[in-house]
Amino acid sequence: MQDAENVAAPEAAEERAEPARQQPVSESPPTDEAAGSGGSEVGRTEDAEEDAEARPEPEVRAKPAAQSEEETAASPAASPTPQSAQEPSAPGKAEAGGEQARHPSARAEEEGGSDGSAAEAEPRALENGEADEPSFSDPEDFVDDVSEEELLGDVLKDRPQEADGIDSVIVVDNVPQVGPDRLEKLKNVIHKIFSKFGKIINDYYPEEDGKTKGYIFLEYASPAHAVDAVKNADGYKLDKQHTFRVNLFTDFDKYMTISDEWDIPEKQPFKDLGNLRYWLEEAECRDQYSVIFESGDRTSIFWNDVKDPVSIEERARWTETYVRWSPKGTYLATFHQRGIALWGGDKFKQIQRFSHQGVQLIDFSPCERYLVTFSPLMDTQDDPQAIIIWDILTGHKKRGFHCESSAHWPIFKWSHDGKFFARMTLDTLSIYETPSMGLLDKKSLKISGIKDFSWSPGGNIIAFWVPEDKDIPARVTLMQLPTRQEIRVRNLFNVVDCKLHWQKNGDYLCVKVDRTPKGTQGVVTNFEIFRMREKQVPVDVVEMKETIIAFAWEPNGSKFAVLHGEAPRISVSFYHVKSNGKIELIKMFDKQQANTIFWSPQGQFVVLAGLRSMNGALAFVDTSDCTVMNIAEHYMASDVEWDPTGRYVVTSVSWWSHKVDNAYWLWTFQGRLLQKNNKDRFCQLLWRPRPPTLLSQDQIKQIKKDLKKYSKIFEQKDRLSQSKASKELVERRRTMMEDFRQYRKMAQELYMKQKNERLELRGGVDTDELDSNVDDWEEETIEFFVTEEVIPLGSQE
């Protein structure tokens, strides 16, 4: 079984790094000059020995008297003894010098140890003050193959480097060619653009025939500013005719050293990952789900089956926290201290890994091409590492980002097709495009006071809202991308808060608006319904004066459900958005014990659940005629998960939220309980998603029309399955009975073999035969006399 914890580095690298973890870091070998001066080293060690003998406390080591300050600084600070500092691990001349420089008493101790006279070595060690000193020297056969970059990479990158002064210079091409009359204006424009990245201390505009040449040189106060300018200003569009190309001046040397001869790249072997969507070809069309139990120590993958779940794969310590499926179900992501691993295929082999120390959160792009990881541990001003976007196919890092402390996950939100992703900061909405990972049109949107935004699941439309500012009303804006055209703006007044809820197909947008009308107390909620598929995007409003607990759209329909009121008077209302724009109340159920709404992925059916504090009350509702099919309870249920087909639903009690009664129960969409699966310290269950169907809407309609024809085939398969299950049950019981008979026969034979031993132990009395003869029985009757006393109630006094 493949080790799931091997994420950030191959096993070979771990084995190479193992000696470094077991031994202290070896010091760098001394110079040839120091190695050759063996006599002076001995003299210094003799002085050190005299100083050590003169000290009253032998535990305190004396610094060599003849050692200079430079040599002191060069010796490792972490070395506990001068011996370990003078015994280099490198071979050759340095090793010979180190051997000469060793303390004479140390050689005497080795000779005494080789002769076996430990009693003589001990007094010498006490005289030298080395009785309790541990040895941190490397063994003679130790080979340190761990480089300094691996151990001290974060420290070495900040070491001083020699600079020739041109690291701070950049070259800007495609600059407008102007004469002396417009040169000053051009300089002001250039300075305004490039001074955002740092202080410009010098500039140079080459001229020819009275005009600039079309390229300029800018020098910054720091090389970091120059790098920042290249990163952000390259590709900047000044106007329709001029788009800047920015490079470092030092890049000239890099490009001039490129060989004129073309080296044919090595052909990379194709890595066959197998069929990553094999589960979709399962004959019974069953779904898979993952289960984490034993407080996270074990993770299993199961086939969902009506009778019992069928285990596919089970591994210990597969993940360190939790798991997550990709949006189309292709990959299973596991979390580790050193990064993320992706698994897939019929054997769940490791597909890819991404090294991100301390990763806590991830997010996939809807197209499964990119992975976003977040870690609070790694982030620097020069090298942003808090958020990293990875290419899943290649495993390469695409870009890193900083993370604000007040941000909410997911920080980046993806468009429905994965072509764009966006993030919100103070008064700014930044939209990036793939695969370049650069800003759309090289600039962010300045939106003063922006509070929240959300992508449409059905198109490249982004919705955002801005609160009121003095006399300016709050507004909700719909923007088409990449053109940035505002297709609808809705002004709102007396707004406290807004929430954006998209219908799964992007047909509707509901903006839940909490507001405080003038002259009234309390909060009133409006549901602003945007009909996205109609011209000019008309808006309808539903007002509710009760407290709103939950809101949810039907995934593939035009209905939505609202939980409102306060316990114990909680109600659920179902609304239907008609084609003419009228919003109709279909049904309202009173006195519901629910705080969450869970729609089936296929629509029509919904589960109203009272999770955690409401003790797991469940109501299964069919919204086609608004009937309650069943009311049940899973005590202290913490989660509800629909399967991708909408046929089954799982309720569970997670060990993460409740420490007892941890289990998951499987129900039909009608509310009929099929299974109760108890798992020790059960933590999490996640269904494996399915990719979108390849069938067209016309084909789906035709299948629904011919459902009766297919249902006969399904019923026949069900009967065969039941018959097969019955045969399997009978066969299993027959096998169990046969196993019992064999065990009973073996026990009887063993019992008879031990008869002689029993006779000997019981003085020749055959106790086996005492109960076999009825004539030897003695019958004894024992009578118990019971006195009954009746006391009338009236005569108790």
Curated annotation (Swiss-Prot):
Return the annotated region ranges for Sufficient for interaction with EIF3J. 153-257
Q: Where is the composition biased (Basic and acidic residues)?
A: 53-62, 100-110
- Cysteines joined through disulfide linkages: none
**Annotated ranges, domain RRM:** 168-251
- Pfam families named among the record's database cross-references: eIF2A, RRM_1
Organism field: Rattus norvegicus
| Regions of compositional bias (Acidic residues) in chain numbering | 129-141
- The source's superkingdom equals Eukaryota
**Compositional bias of type Low complexity: which residue ranges?**
63-91
This protein's encoding gene:
Eif3b
List of residues that carry N6-acetyllysine:
K192, K271, K347
Phosphothreonine modification sites are T31, T72
Q: Which residues carry this modification: N-acetylmethionine?
A: M1
| Name of the featured protein | Eukaryotic translation initiation factor 3 subunit B
**Sequence similarity:** Belongs to the eIF-3 subunit B family.
What does the subunit section of this Swiss-Prot or TrEMBL entry state?
A: Component of the eukaryotic translation initiation factor 3 (eIF-3) complex, which is composed of 13 subunits: EIF3A, EIF3B, EIF3C, EIF3D, EIF3E, EIF3F, EIF3G, EIF3H, EIF3I, EIF3J, EIF3K, EIF3L and EIF3M. The eIF-3 complex appears to include 3 stable modules: module A is composed of EIF3A, EIF3B, EIF3G and EIF3I; module B is composed of EIF3F, EIF3H, and EIF3M; and module C is composed of EIF3C, EIF3D, EIF3E, EIF3K and EIF3L. EIF3C of module C binds EIF3B of module A and EIF3H of module B, thereby linking the three modules. EIF3J is a labile subunit that binds to the eIF-3 complex via EIF3B.
Q: What is known of its domains?
A: The RRM domain mediates interaction with EIF3J.
The segment annotated Disordered runs over 1-141
Q: Where are the stretches annotated Sufficient for interaction with EIF3E?
A: 107-396
Q: What does this protein do?
A: RNA-binding component of the eukaryotic translation initiation factor 3 (eIF-3) complex, which is required for several steps in the initiation of protein synthesis. The eIF-3 complex associates with the 40S ribosome and facilitates the recruitment of eIF-1, eIF-1A, eIF-2:GTP:methionyl-tRNAi and eIF-5 to form the 43S pre-initiation complex (43S PIC). The eIF-3 complex stimulates mRNA recruitment to the 43S PIC and scanning of the mRNA for AUG recognition.
Q: How is it modified after translation?
A: Phosphorylated. Phosphorylation is enhanced upon serum stimulation.
